[in-house]
């Protein structure tokens, strides 16, 4: 790096929100924007893996493309995902594709000072191979809920190589503990980045007639919104004198199932599916919310919980690992995973004490 020149970081994510799921890996975009705003020269390389179902269209697909974002550019290259036939061959092809992107990138932007990969396999492994070959320091940040698989069985050789040729970080402390205790891999905590400033507006007055719950989530397996709906059904049956409203923000592959479940449980009059919303729209919804409800079976971090706290909104969450590191009695109620009755009890506890919570402590959590 030349004297007085900005730090140059090249980000390599495993996931990127350019397919049907516009939320998967969205934190990578927030991360790059934050680096750029801090004065770091930042860009991104992404391998867009196409499933074999895309094979008929693949020959005519544009193989190389780019996407301009706030403060950085994402350089993309498509490849076929052949992991169903051979995971080893797929990873080798992935590494070659990343190197092609890297060589083209260096011609345009010069050699980066740091490679920052997100998720150990495949992006972390590919970055570690690049770093060793081209003498570039590598940082890996692990986000995946199934990260232990990268250090076990046939994948272990790739995960261990990546960890030994990088500075290893994870978004939550429980992940670093597992890496250290089970796999003898030193790692530090590097939390996800969120734009909390967007959520620090004033809260709207409470609605004395209703306790308003909100879930902000991609509607995909593992988010377990069906458990939240079951908890709402229990509340309605056991406490008919209490009124709850539940807003679900987001979309995804489980949306139709969740809507069908809400209807079957007779909850259509109190449950609203409002679809995907912008950051400012989510902030407005949270300003009119009494508690955020998270029902996931596992979250490595939990950005919606951080956004809710920034908005002064307490959180009701399952004990889903990541959020437990920053939720406490001043701002949250916890319940067991896949336990609608325990979630019902947590909602009742929060409803009973929400008026006594210190908004300043919630925002500072």
Each model region followed by its residue ranges:
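Conserved donor-binding/catalytic core segment of Leloir-type glycosyltransferases
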Residues: 10, 169, 205-234, 247
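Carbohydrate-associated surface elements
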Residues: 174, 193
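Conserved acidic donor-binding segment of nucleotide-sugar-dependent glycosyltransferases
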Residues: 329, 333-340, 349-355
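Nucleotide-activated donor-binding/catalytic signature segment of Leloir-type glycosyltransferases, i.e.
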Residues: 259-277
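Short hydrophobic beta-strand element within catalytic cores of glycosyltransferases
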Residues: 314-317
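Short alpha-helical donor nucleotide-sugar binding micro-motif in glycosyltransferases
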Residues: 276-277, 284-289
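Aromatic "clamp/platform" in nucleotide-sugar-dependent glycosyltransferases that forms part
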Residues: 297
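N-terminal subdomain of nucleotide-sugar transferases
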Residues: 1-66
């Amino acid at each position: 790096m030349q004297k007085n020149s900005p730090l140059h970081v090249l980000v390599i994510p495993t996931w990127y929100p350019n397919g049907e799921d516009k939320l998967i890996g969205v934190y990578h975009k927030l991360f790059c924007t934050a680096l750029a705003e801090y004065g770091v020269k930042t860009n991104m390389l992404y391998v867009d893996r196409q499933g074999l179902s895309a094979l008929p269209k693949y020959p005519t697909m544009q193989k190389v493309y780019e996407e301009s974002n706030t403060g950085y550019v994402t350089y993309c290259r498509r490849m076929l995902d052949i992991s169903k036939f051979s995971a080893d061959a797929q990873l080798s092809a992935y590494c070659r594709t990343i190197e092609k992107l890297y060589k083209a990138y260096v011609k345009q932007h010069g050699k980066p000072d740091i490679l920052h990969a997100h998720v150990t396999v495949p992006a972390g492994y590919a970055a570690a191979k690049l770093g060793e070959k081209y003498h570039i320091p590598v940082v890996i940040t692990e986000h995946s809920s199934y990260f232990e698989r990268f250090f076990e069985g046939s994948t272990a050789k790739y995960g261990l190589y990546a960890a030994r040729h990088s500075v290893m970080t994870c978004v939550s402390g429980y992940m670093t503990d597992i890496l250290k205790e089970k796999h003898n891999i030193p790692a530090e905590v590097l939390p996800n980045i969120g734009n909390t400033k967007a959520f620090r507006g004033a809260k709207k007055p409470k609605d004395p007639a209703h306790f308003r719950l909100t879930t902000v989530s991609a509607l995909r397996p593992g988010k377990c919104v069906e458990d939240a709906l079951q908890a709402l059904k229990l509340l309605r049956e056991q406490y008919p004198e209490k009124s709850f409203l539940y807003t679900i923000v987001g979309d995804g592959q489980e949306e139709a199932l969740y809507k069908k479940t809400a209807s079957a449980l007779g909850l259509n009059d109190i449950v609203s599916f409002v679809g995907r919303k912008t950051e400012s729209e989510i902030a407005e919804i949270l300003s009119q919310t009494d508690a955020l409800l998270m029902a996931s079976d596992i979250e490595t971090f939990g950005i919606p919980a951080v956004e809710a706290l920034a908005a002064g909104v307490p959180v009701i969450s399952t004990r889903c690992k990541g959020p437990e590191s920053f939720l406490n009695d001043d701002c949250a109620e916890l319940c067991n995973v896949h336990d609608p009755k325990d979630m019902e009890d947590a909602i009742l506890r929060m409803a009973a004490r929400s008026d006594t919570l210190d908004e300043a402590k919630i925002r500072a959590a």
